[in-house]
Amino acid sequence: MEAFTRLDAKAAPLPLANIDTDQIIPKQFLKTVERAGLAKGLFYDLRFDEQGREKPNFVLNRPEYKGAGVLVAGDNFGCGSSREHAPWALMDFGIRCVISTSFADIFYGNCFQNGLLPVVLKAEEVQQLMDEARGGNHVVSVDLEAQTVTSPSGAVFRFEIDPQRKDKMLRGLDAIGETLQSQKDIDVYEMKRALAQPWLEGA
């Protein structure tokens, strides 16, 4: 998993509450376990019309937000069914951080397992970021080490994060990476078990 330390990127405002995982990545794109290529399904029904043409007014289709790395979203982002494809699609599109006033619990946890940073700010702070992102300067700075978000105008907002999750994001550790940190202990255990219970070998 790619580590997250600091991000300076365009911010795209999506002032819609209760965006669920089916809106983030519709069910027809869930047939794969490959992460690459899921960007095409991100917000599909919001980004495209029935003929598959881009809707020019949707924020991520507008030229000034092309290449956005931060999404500033409405309340309760990521609600609905559990699907790890949701953070995968956001990441594949180039989004590394989502800022909202709240996230659904399962989506929030899935973000940390995939290198996508979910940031919770106060309602007035999220609104200010959205307002500023609609202006001419869209660049927002997210500093995980300092736990701050700096708006285009220079306003600094502090966010809270679980220390263990923060450490794993800074080091780029998902669940597998965290387990591999104990590889030596695992190897020692396997050797001892093989000596004590040789009949289990090859079972």
From Swiss-Prot:
It comes from the Bacteria. It catalyses: (2R,3S)-3-isopropylmalate = (2S)-2-isopropylmalate. Pathway: Amino-acid biosynthesis; L-leucine biosynthesis; L-leucine from 3-methyl-2-oxobutanoate: step 2/4. Transmembrane segments: none annotated. One of its GO terms (cellular component) is 3-isopropylmalate dehydratase complex. Its EC number is 4.2.1.33. GO terms for molecular function: 3-isopropylmalate dehydratase activity. It is an enzyme of class 4 (lyase). Keywords: Amino-acid biosynthesis, Branched-chain amino acid biosynthesis, Leucine biosynthesis, Lyase. GO terms for biological process: L-leucine biosynthetic process. The keyword Amino-acid biosynthesis applies. It holds the Pfam family Aconitase_C. Belongs to the LeuD family. LeuD type 1 subfamily. HAMAP family: LeuD_type1. Heterodimer of LeuC and LeuD. Catalyzes the isomerization between 2-isopropylmalate and 3-isopropylmalate, via the formation of 2-isopropylmaleate. This is 3-isopropylmalate dehydratase small subunit. The gene is leuD.
